[in-house]
From Swiss-Prot:
GO annotation, biological process: catecholamine catabolic process; developmental process; dopamine metabolic process; lipid metabolic process; methylation
EC class (word): transferase
Note describing how the cofactor binds: Binds 1 Mg(2+) ion per subunit.
Phosphoserine carried by residues: 267
EC numbers, comma separated: 2.1.1.6
Species, as recorded: Bos taurus (Bovine)
Extracellular topology ranges: 28-272
Catalytic activities: a catechol + S-adenosyl-L-methionine = a guaiacol + S-adenosyl-L-homocysteine + H(+); 2-hydroxyestrone + S-adenosyl-L-methionine = 2-hydroxy-3-methoxy-estrone + S-adenosyl-L-homocysteine + H(+); 4-hydroxyestrone + S-adenosyl-L-methionine = 4-methoxyestrone + S-adenosyl-L-homocysteine + H(+); 2-hydroxyestrone + S-adenosyl-L-methionine = 2-methoxyestrone + S-adenosyl-L-homocysteine + H(+)
The name this protein goes by in its record: Catechol O-methyltransferase
Length: 272
């Protein structure tokens, strides 16, 4: 049986992609956002991976190693931004929303910061570069390849003394934070993993006694791809004080935003 050459498969894939985009790309912003993600993550990414023999995440790391300055976190952030803007779209928080993250972090000055979802380490490096002496960041990543790239990124930035990369599912690691990682309570949590895990993981943090009065949770992508159950819960519950920062999906014109949630303490049942 004859096998189709890779380029023929690619051409066929692109043809199917264009047909899919004709259906997805309407005037509805949600459909436009969906088309943007489908094109970049489910069409172009596997095509490039096939042709180049490496993953997008590996290419991002190589770009950083070649163009950033070792021990300079800001140059690492800038290199990732330039690659994701000019070469291949990637799901980092990005420069526009990153400035919001910077501002919140500077205001809070956390001693213990938890990140849910490391991906390639962009936000870990971005946040850790602003931490005060003695402060630390734990970042939980489920994908072992992403966790390894994050670890390499953190080490290249010279932040290995501030950042601990934890491999595993958030729902498995969160109950271990107190005993295994010596966490009493968290000053700040950055949520940027699976959007359907935002609400259950926040409630799990509360159940495990990791939230204190004044703990700040900053959730990315609450508009697109969206975390409607999370927003509905925190905005309708007296245990939380919410504020919204409107912005755009990383490296795009798709409307997005971050939600800042301040935990006011347990004044009612922890489950919706």
């Amino acid at each position: 049986m004859l096998e189709a050459p890779p380029l023929l498969l690619v051409a066929g894939g692109v043809g199917l992609a264009l047909l899919a985009l004709r259906w997805l790309a309407t005037t509805d912003l949600q459909f436009f956002g969906r088309a943007f993600i489908v094109w970049n993550e489910f069409i172009m990414k596997p095509i490039r991976n096939l042709l180049m023999g490496s993953s997008k995440e590996q290419r991002i790391l190589q770009h950083v190693l070649q163009h950033a300055v070792a021990g300079d976190p800001q140059s690492v952030v800038a290199a990732i931004d330039s690659y994701s803007l000019e070469k291949e779209w990637a799901m980092h928080v990005g420069e526009k929303k990153g400035q919001i993250v910077d501002r919140v972090l500077r205001e809070q000055q956390p001693s213990v910061l938890l990140e849910l979802g490391a991906y390639c380490g962009y936000s870990a490096v971005r946040m850790a570069r602003l931490l005060l002496p003695g402060a630390r960041l734990l970042t939980i990543e489920f994908n072992p390849d992403y966790a390894a790239i994050t670890q390499r990124m953190v080490e290249f930035a010279g932040l290995q003394d501030k950042v601990t990369v934890v491999l595993g599912a958030s729902q498995d690691i969160i109950p271990q934070l107190k005993k295994k990682y010596d966490v009493d309570t968290l000053d700040m949590v950055f949520l940027d993993h699976w959007k359907d895990r935002y609400l259950p993981d926040m409630l799990l943090l509360e159940e495990c006694g990791l939230l204190r009065e004044g703990t700040v949770l900053l959730a990315d992508n609450v508009i697109y791809p969206g975390a409607p159950d999370f927003l509905e819960y925190v905005r309708g519950n007296s245990r939380f004080e919410c504020s919204h920062f409107s912005s755009y999906l990383e490296y795009s014109k798709v409307v997005d935003g971050l939600e800042k949630v301040v935990y006011k303490g347990l004044s009612g049942p922890a489950r919706p």
